[in-house]
Every structure is written in C-alpha cells, then in structure tokens.
Amino acid sequence: KNIMATAVLKAIRNKHKKANIIVITSHPDVFIDNPNVNKVLVHGTVSGIYKDYIAGKDNKVFITDPYSASDYLTESKNLIEIWCNLCDVPYKDELPEIFLSKSEIEYFAPFYKLDKPIMVIQPCGGPIEQPLKYNWVRDVPPVVMQDIINAFKDEYAIVHIKRQDQMTYENTTAALDSWRSIAVLLMMSKRRVLIDSSAQHIAAALGLPSMVLWIGTSSKVFGYEMHANVDASTPDKEINLDHMYYQRLPLFEDISKCPYT
C-alpha cells in the first residue's frame, strides 16, 4: 500500500506543485529521495502534529482509507485511481516510484551476483505480523510453484523472496532482506514470477514487466497493465459469501476456506 501511495503522492504534487508536502508513514524508507515529498514523519513516533502542521495553517490534510471506498469494495477501479479520487486530485495513470541511490545499488548488487541469469519468485506474501504462513487468497499453491521452479532451475538462478517463517523450495536461494535490496535484486533479474504483494508493486515502480499470478484478489484493483497478469481458474467449489466482510474475499484467509480442491 505504501508503494502504491507514491503514485498518489505524485498525483498530489502534480496538482499542488508548490505545496510543502509532509508524509506520515510506518514505512519511511519507501519515500527516501522521493522529490515529491518535503518531509517524512514516522507514524506513531511524533507528537504535536496538530500544533506544528495543522493549527492555523493554510493546508490540506489527506487522511483517507481507499479500502473502505465503494469502488474498492465493488472492484470497479484501480486502487491508485480510487485513492486519487478520495484526495480530489486528477488521476493520470500515475505509477509508483522508487528512487535508489548509486551507493545503494553498488552495495546490494554484489550479493546477487550468481552464476546464471536471475529469475525472481515471490510465491507468498504478507507482512511479518501476519499469522498465516500460507494465505490461499494471494499465495501460489506450492505444487504450482514447484512446477515453475522445476521448469526453469537449469537455466536460471532462482531467488525466492520470502519471510523467515515461510516455506522454502529446493533449487532456490532465499532473499531475506529489506525492500530496497529487493528492488536492486529485481533490477538485476531477467525473469520475475510474482503475486499480489510488494514485489509486483516494486517491479511496476521500476518499469519491469513481470508475470503476476492472481488467486483471489483482483488485477483490476491491485495490478498494472505492464505486467502479464494471470488469473486463477474458476474455483471447484462455491465461494462462501456468508461472512462478515464487505468485499467478496478478505485479503487474508486460512487454507481451510479455500474453494479449490
């Protein structure tokens, strides 16, 4: 979401060209060297925000949740467009942006110098605090991922983006590092097989067309036209819609609820 927010930030800057833009975020490293932001504050660590930045100031405050918008719940528009609409700024097909310094690239690149061209996979996603090691709504079934690995392992060095607690695959090398080092890895890769998670947003920000596998979430809402978006087949079983959520499926759900056999 923070990476997608850089596209919204660009749209805000396009409308408010002379504004002093302050971003409050839990992921400040996403906005390093971004020319569209003047200052970054870390969410939950700064007091006096109202006194210092709002009271008596001629400003606009953008505190919106696109996940509660009608167009998101009905899956009728891309999330970036939805977010721009909520902020009352024109959406002109802005894409996420990542700004890597030369020193960052030179530091991380040697870690990914392998003996074959690099193919990056991200079969599972989700934040560190997510309790599910496998989330059927977004994660690739292990048997499918293993078939992909087997097909490419002789030609490519396969680097696996994963959390520490997620499953590993033979004939892969784990990439357990910051998202900025992952950005360098993606820049160095020749092929990418990703899911609806951080790496596909980083790839879009870097202008790297990738194959993205979609299981339960919508490529229309979360995806990018530059990618080869592959939708899952129709479920074998009827999806249980008798739940407490406002959207068709939650972003995280246990394997016991999976409608595929």
Question: Where do the protein language model's features map onto the residues?
Answer:
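Catalytic machinery of carbohydrate-active enzymes
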Residues: K1-T261
